[in-house]
Amino acid sequence: FWMIPVAVLKKLGGFCPLFYHYGEDKDFVNRLHYHQYQIGYSPKVFGNHDRKYRPITHEGFLRTEYVYHLSEYANINYPWIKAFGYSVLAVMKKAMTSLISGKFRLSKDYLNMEVRLLARSQEIHSYRKTNRLSQPHYIQK
C-alpha cells in the first residue's frame, strides 16, 4: 500500500513511463532516495494480490530478470557507468555463466536481454536525466 503526499508525486514527476506494470515501484523508491526522501513501512501490514497462485514460468522468470536489470540501468543513484555495470554487464555475466554451465537456452535468453537493454540505452539515458529534475514531468493535467 502506498501513501504518497501529492507534493512528493509532483516533485518526483509521478511514475516513469519506462516501467509499465512492473518495476515502477523500485524505480519510484530509487527516485525518492535520490531526492532525499525517507521511506517508512509497517512490518505488521500485509498486502496480497487477489488472484490465483500461478507457478513461475521460464518466460515469467525472464521478465522479472529484465525488469530488475532495467531498474538498475535507470537507477539515478548510480553514475552511468555503475548503472551500466549493474545491468548490461551483469546480464552478460549471467549469459556467460549459463553458457559455461551448459544452459544454452538460458544463455541465449540472457544475450537477448542484453541486446534489448542496449537498444534502450538512449531512452534510459534520457529518463535518467529527466528523473533528476524536481518537476511533475509525468503527471498529466
Ranges and model annotations:
Residues 14-17, 52, 93:
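A broad detector of the eukaryotic-type serine/threonine protein kinase catalytic domain
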Residues 31-86:
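A contiguous binding-surface segment within folded domains or other stable secondary-structure elements
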Residues 20, 24-27, 33, 78, ...:
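Short linear sequence elements within intrinsically disordered, low-complexity coil regions
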